[in-house]
Every structure is written in structure tokens, then in C-alpha cells.
Amino acid sequence: MYQVMLVALGGAIGSAARFTLSGLVLRYSLDWRFPLPTFTVNIIGCLVIGMLAGLASKEGFISPDMRVLLFTGLVGGFTTFSAFGLETLVLLREGLVGIAAAYIVSSIVVGLVLMWLGFELVKMTMQA
């Protein structure tokens, strides 16, 4: 039950952060069809989870409870694959196949690159 509460706490914080960041990105972005708020949240989430994975790779650096709070709760509540899927479907239904394809490819490629970068940054920092 304790870990469920940790997930709920992390999820609440992550969801509130997602809502806030998405609103800021929407307010300051150009009016175009690319779903920039969700894209921004998801790539930042990839960077953060990469950094957390780098920290977790050090034995005992992140406790199992903290891992549940951060990975499952915080980052899980922050990123949003379901919104990514829905926005892609809307783009496809509106006939915006090129934008949908760019969104899919850039989300995956940029997300993976930032995950790797986050992991490597933490690894380099911890070696110094």
C-alpha cells in the first residue's frame, strides 16, 4: 500500500507539471498543427527518465521506493503516450499525414536521443 501511495504522489506532481508546462508551451508557441505541448512534455520526460536511469544504474543510489515514486509516479504522470496517440489519430483523420508522420518520427527519435543523453550526462557527471 505504501508504494501505491508513492505512485499516487509522484503521479499527482507529474500530472500537475505536465498541465503547467503544456499550458506554457501552448501560450508561447506559434499557431500550427504540430502538437508541440505534448511533444515537449514527452521529450523532456525522456531526458528525465534517462537521467534517472543513469542514477539508478549506480548500486544503491536510488532506493526501490524512490524508484517507484520517480519512475512510475512522477515521470509516468508527466509523460502522456495516450495524448500522443490521440493527437496522431486526429492529424491522420484530418488528412495531415505528413505532420502526423513527422510527429511520430520526431517523438520517437528525439525521445530516444534525449533518453540516451540524460543517461550519459549522469554517467559522466558521476565519474568526475
Swiss-Prot record:
Origin: domain of life: Bacteria
A Gene Ontology BP annotation from the UniProt entry: cellular detoxification of fluoride
Keywords recorded for this protein, A-Z: Cell inner membrane, Cell membrane, Ion channel, Ion transport, Membrane, Metal-binding, Sodium, Transmembrane, Transmembrane helix, Transport
Catalytic activity of the protein: fluoride(in) = fluoride(out)
Membrane topology annotation: Multi-pass membrane protein
TM stretches of this protein: 6-26, 36-56, 68-88, 99-119
Gene giving rise to this polypeptide: fluC
Protein known as: Fluoride-specific ion channel FluC
Record bears the keyword Iron: no
Residues holding Na(+): 76, 79
Record family assignment: Belongs to the fluoride channel Fluc/FEX (TC 1.A.43) family.
InterPro entries associated with the record: FluC
Location relative to the cell: Cell inner membrane
Known role: Fluoride-specific ion channel. Important for reducing fluoride concentration in the cell, thus reducing its toxicity.
Taxonomy of the source species: Bacteria, Pseudomonadati, Pseudomonadota, Betaproteobacteria, Nitrosomonadales
Activity modulation: Na(+) is not transported, but it plays an essential structural role and its presence is essential for fluoride channel function.
GO molecular function, one term: metal ion binding
GO cellular-component term (any): plasma membrane
NCBIfam families, per database record: crcB
